[in-house]
Amino acid sequence: MQILLANPRGFCAGVDRAISIVERAIEMYGAPIYVRHEVVHNRYVVESLCERGAIFIEEISEVPDGSILIFSAHGVSQAVRAEARSRNLTMLFDATCPLVTKVHMEVARASRKGKEAILIGHAGHPEVEGTMGQYSNPNGGMYLVESPDDVWQLNVKDENNLCFMTQTTLSVDDTSAVIDALNTRFPKIVGPRKDDICYATTNRQEAVRNLANDADIVLVVGSKNSSNSNRLAELVQRMGKPAYLIDSAADIQEFWLQGAQCIGVTAGASAPDILVQQVIARLKDLGAGESIELSGREENIVFEVPKELRVEVKQID
């Protein structure tokens, strides 16, 4: 069996920044450090940070007075931000991905101008909850759609004063279909100046598409609650190839590999490379040969941590 590795795969700049913020806060201020929601959607990362002194909570009320709080990479609503600022906290750091913040600013701008806004996204995802929570104009409207069917059923106040934006981790193909429906249903709707789906999501979907062309099966390293990891597995499955979303090498089932000559491996944007290396080692134990990395788009984007946290610390592998 041959192992093919997608390129690019794994950590994106927003995830790197978010994890670094938690690591550096622990290093500078000591444990415990409170984080609202999982800083990124990866079990290994969350467990590793817990071992170092991070405490993950869902409600601001769970944070004791005088503590240090960090918002996750997915962002928070205006209401959550205001609640945190009203508390007697020592420090408050925001690990929201800058590309998510860009979408937040689009929604806030629409709210100020009185435009109705439509968000393409998955209900219940923390990024969607945070983005929807940027809209506060009582005379306007903020709506969530997930599919073309949602668009056809949507009723708005003023079809001539509409804009749309998207969750950053969606399927490029699925989103395109929803945007087509929006443009047909509401001809005067205005979209973002630049695509809201982030570079890392787009690049990893392109890379896994190339990978699936050559692989018999594809293993996607990522947690079940990771939106971008799920989209990678779905893309492969739509191409007619089996794809399995796994948290770690221990999840691999030998029968998946029966008859496969070429096994593709990729990782979602919140999955660290150490998990990919463990998957490769497991596949070799099961008889696979050396791994070969495909060519792909080079990524050089770096997002800086807050200036208060710019110290050298040991990072998660």
Curated annotation (Swiss-Prot):
Listed pathway(s): Isoprenoid biosynthesis; dimethylallyl diphosphate biosynthesis; dimethylallyl diphosphate from (2E)-4-hydroxy-3-methylbutenyl diphosphate: step 1/1; Isoprenoid biosynthesis; isopentenyl diphosphate biosynthesis via DXP pathway; isopentenyl diphosphate from 1-deoxy-D-xylulose 5-phosphate: step 6/6
Positions contributing to [4Fe-4S] cluster binding: 12, 97, 198
Catalytic center residues: 127
Cofactor note: Binds 1 [4Fe-4S] cluster per subunit.
Gene Ontology BP term (one): dimethylallyl diphosphate biosynthetic process
Keyword Metal-binding listed: yes
UniProt keyword terms in alphabetical order: 4Fe-4S, Iron, Iron-sulfur, Isoprene biosynthesis, Metal-binding, Oxidoreductase
Signal peptide: none
Class in the EC hierarchy, top level: oxidoreductase
NCBIfam families, alphabetized: ispH_lytB, PRK01045.1-2, PRK01045.1-4
Protein purpose: Catalyzes the conversion of 1-hydroxy-2-methyl-2-(E)-butenyl 4-diphosphate (HMBPP) into a mixture of isopentenyl diphosphate (IPP) and dimethylallyl diphosphate (DMAPP). Acts in the terminal step of the DOXP/MEP pathway for isoprenoid precursor biosynthesis.
Family: Belongs to the IspH family.
Name used for this protein in its record: 4-hydroxy-3-methylbut-2-enyl diphosphate reductase
Organism: Yersinia pseudotuberculosis serotype O:3 (strain YPIII)
